[in-house]
Swiss-Prot record:
Function: Bifunctional enzyme that catalyzes the epimerization of the S- and R-forms of NAD(P)HX and the dehydration of the S-form of NAD(P)HX at the expense of ADP, which is converted to AMP. This allows the repair of both epimers of NAD(P)HX, a damaged form of NAD(P)H that is a result of enzymatic or heat-dependent hydration.
Binding site for ADP: 385-389, 404-413
Cofactor(s) the protein needs: K(+)
Domain YjeF C-terminal: residue ranges: 215-466
Annotated region described as ADP-dependent (S)-NAD(P)H-hydrate dehydratase, given as residue ranges: 215-466
Organism: Helicobacter pylori (strain ATCC 700392 / 26695)
Biological processes per GO annotation: metabolite repair; nicotinamide nucleotide metabolic process
Annotated cofactor note: Binds 1 potassium ion per subunit.
EC number: 4.2.1.136, 5.1.99.6
Lineage: superkingdom: Bacteria
Name assigned to this protein: Bifunctional NAD(P)H-hydrate repair enzyme Nnr
The YjeF N-terminal domain, residue ranges: 8-207
Gene Ontology molecular function: ADP-dependent NAD(P)H-hydrate dehydratase activity; ATP binding; metal ion binding; NAD(P)HX epimerase activity
SUPFAM superfamilies in alphabetical order: Ribokinase-like, YjeF N-terminal domain-like
Length: 466
């Protein structure tokens, strides 16, 4: 997994003061990272246009232009007059190297931005408020085949809020380390592929300790059956309580069985199970089992059962969906449980604990709110769903950006609850269960050719093939 930071000012300051890497060295390495991206995505001789701003982000662009000129048809548009000392220095160096630099004329109709690669080096991490009208990157980038953002696409602020005219990159090179603003739900459509641009020193030397991490494909640890002398009891008993909409719980149960649980049982609370809708591989119980490894409640549920508090004492659990609308869920916040709400459900839970905020406030501050909640309830693991999933525990937050839009379909969350339950029943810690189930869920969604057609049962089949 990769370290994530809200800002990297402290990292740059340390690199300069402790590692004796000057601003010039850092900027040259940033330009080299951008240069590698151009070389990987365009042939020699291709037309490359670089949009440069007035600060150090613009300086990166001018340094890049100097490195490309002679091998590519390189053109720089000066979107704003160079102001920072490093930007001015890099602009002069670019001019001396023969780079063509044109002033961008806001009202000029004949400026041709058709190119093979368009690179945004305009604002970077200093964006606040709204973009100036002439910086409408949606129209500026229409004729570019491939678009690269330097550090942060212009129009995304430090909280991950996005201006409607923001630069929509195919690739973002985050300089030095990953910034948290690039991982917001709203930024997902603007960042494209995300890579780190190393600034002249190995990233683990450049970085400082952090409480925020980005999950990678390599972090997934699938269930392992490495013993030959074993039986079903060695792999846990997972129990799913079915609500009024029984299909949701049945999906969770099938998902848990497919992810390694030795036994999966179900119990109807608000529904009636007939012989026509009984999956043969599940064990159907009339009562809550005395011996079990973990249970899940909430999928398709309308009311909290009266024995809920007693069940919390018997085994670890996954709580989802319907439970977050009932005050009885508060009993679980002092137990080792995994909560898996989507934003609307999380708002309801926050209201129950006395935090009244709007959906807009939640989406604008999702990372901070999830972290604060996990610190207030240290026994709980919170998995907050969204375009990017947040997993928070005791102040640490793990961000999963691996999933696809294919998961935006009823039943996907029920499958996820089942995956978490399965790992919990197999003696994974609650945090490891949430992280690995979320990763498997996301990666399986990428295996489907047509993202509009994925069904929950298809998803379970793909999970079996990981």
């Amino acid at each position: 997994m990769l370290s994530v930071y809200e800002k990297v000012n402290a990292l740059d300051k340390r690199a300069i003061e402790e590692l004796f890497l000057s601003e010039d060295i850092l900027m040259e390495n940033a330009a080299m990272a951008l240069e590698r991206a151009v070389l990987q995505n365009a042939s020699l001789g291709a037309k490359v246009i670089i949009l440069c701003g007035s600060g150090d982000n613009g300086g990166d662009g001018y340094a890049l232009a100097r490195r490309l000129v002679g091998r590519f048809k390189t053109l720089v548009f000066e979107m704003k007059l160079a102001k920072s000392p490093m930007c001015q220095l890099q602009q002069e160096r670019a001019k001396k190297a023969g780079v063509v630099i044109k002033a961008y004329e806001e009202n000029a109709l004949n400026q041709n931005l058709e190119c093979d690669v368009l690179i945004d080096c305009v604002i970077g991490s200093h964006f606040k408020g709204k973009l100036e009208p002439f910086l409408n990157f949606e129209s500026l980038s229409q004729k570019a085949r491939f678009k690269i953002a330097c550090d942060i696409p212009s129009g995304i602020d430090s909280k991950g809020r996005v201006d409607k005219g923001a630069f929509k990159a195919d690739l973002t090179i985050s300089m030095g380390a990953i910034k948290s603003c690039l991982l917001s739900d709203r930024a997902k459509d603007y960042v494209g592929e995300l890579k780190v641009g190393h600034l002249g020193v190995f990233n683990q030397i450049y970085e400082i300790p952090t409480d925020t991490f980005l999950l990678e494909k390599s972090d997934l640890k699938l269930p392992l059956r490495d013993r030959k002398n074993a039986h079903k009891g060695d792999y846990g008993h997972a129990h799913v309580l079915l609500g009024k909409h029984s299909g949701a719980g049945l999906l969770s149960a099938l998902s848990a069985l497919s992810f390694g649980s030795g036994v999966v049982s179900v119990q109807a609370l608000e529904c009636e199970i007939t012989s026509n809708n009984k999956p043969l591989e599940l064990v159907f119980c009339e009562n809550f089992p005395n011996l079990l490894s973990a249970f899940a409640l909430g999928m398709g549920l309308e009311n909290i059962p009266k024995d809920f508090n007693k069940w919390l004492e018997l085994a670890p659990c996954v709580l989802d969906a319907g439970v977050f609308y009932h005050k009885e869920v508060l009993q679980a916040l002092e137990k080792e449980v995994i909560l898996t709400p989507h934003p609307k459900e999380f708002l309801s839970l926050l209201k129950l604990v006395g935090i009244n905020i709007s959906m807009l406030e939640l989406l604008d501050n999702k990372l901070e709110i999830a972290r604060d909640f996990s610190q207030k309830y240290p026994k709980v693991v919170l998995l907050l769903k969204g375009a990017n999933t947040l997993i928070a525990h005791q102040g640490q937050v793990f961000i999963n950006i691996l999933g696809s839009v294919a998961l935006a379909k009823a039943g996907s969350g029920d499958v996820l609850a089942g995956l978490i339950l399965s790992l919990l029943s197999q003696n994974y810690t609650p945090l490891d269960a949430a992280i690995n189930a979320s990763s498997a869920h996301a990666l399986a969604s990428l295996e489907f050719k047509n993202n509009y057609a994925l069904t929950p049962l298809d998803l379970i089949e793909k999970i079996k093939q990981l």
